[in-house]
Amino acid sequence: LNADLQTTAYNSLGDRRGAVVALDPSTGKILAMVSKPDFDPNTISQNWDTLVNDENNSSLLNRATMGQYPPGSTFKVVTALDYFRTKRSFNGFSFDCQGSITKEDHTIQCYNGKVHGTEDFYTAFANSCNCAFAEIGTELGGASLLKTSEDLLFNQKLPLTSYRKSSFTLNGSSGIPLIMQTAIGQGNTLVSPMHMALITSAIANDGVLMKPYLIDKVTNAGGDTVSTTEPANYKRLMTSNEAALLGKLMEGVVQNGTATALNGRGYTVAGKTGSAEYDENGSSHSWFIGYSNVDDPDLVVAIIVEGGGTGSEAAVPIAADLFDAYYFD
């Protein structure tokens, strides 16, 4: 762990529920991992009964690796990848967003019903246009989205020792309403912050996911090194060209889209915000995934703030704190 990043992540999340993960995409080294509500390990034996029975806070749950959340619009990186694999290009895409789209009596709206007008693929991604991506999802279909999602380790084992497997339920017989919801990161899809960090790391590392690790080396009482961890490739999740194209989409989010608060801060960032609705009242978790120093990425972050609203409201400011701490502190 990077002590400065860990402290920054802990303090920036504050007393809110959620999780923060930071990785080095080129090695897989976990630089920070925070889950809240947390507990004091020094008093865990005295407080064990309270912690175990506190279902409201679930302090013993490591939300970073075990938490299961709707991905919201961060899932649009998956939908975008599936579109590219199907069409072989983002060029030629055009969509006229009127703020809502209805198919089979099911309506999807953009945030606050915003009308985006005519968009190409890059603009639709930067705007996080739900209508465009609902249309894209129905064109791709459930079977295609399932294949690409499983390529990105949904419904698959992850290179971790303790985690919950992310779930994706679409298939070739799924109906249009569920496909529309799933393509924008709602529906039945559930994912952990660590899993989203791994997908982002592959994008930042030319498509290759490195095996994540916490411990650099183990030494004995005499200071001699007993074992070391060497960075290791886990799996290629996408081609280098696919990773570069997704990176360009994510750069547009910071330059012209929903994460412009990260623009012009002395470093470059590519990212994707998300607002994951979790109840009938439209309450949402705040998401951000991204990486910095886009020409030679060295820091990946994935952040969720439970009940935090839009990605730009709660998660993006935490990302800014992490990037600032990494480059300037």
Report the location of each language-model feature.
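Short, charged, low-complexity patches
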Residues: M196, G311-V316, A320
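Beta-lactam-recognizing serine transpeptidase/beta-lactamase-like catalytic domain environment
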Residues: S26-S73, V78-G307
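Conserved, well-ordered alpha-helix/loop/beta-strand core segments that scaffold catalytic motifs
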Residues: L1-G18
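Charged catalytic carboxylate motif
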Residues: D4, T8, S144, L245, ...
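Short, gly/Ser/Thr-rich active-site loops of penicillin-recognizing serine hydrolases
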Residues: T225-S227, I318-D329
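Short hydrophobic alpha-helical segments used for membrane anchoring or interfacial signaling
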Residues: V20-P25
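Short, intrinsically disordered, mixed-charge
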Residues: G14, E251-Q255, D324, F328
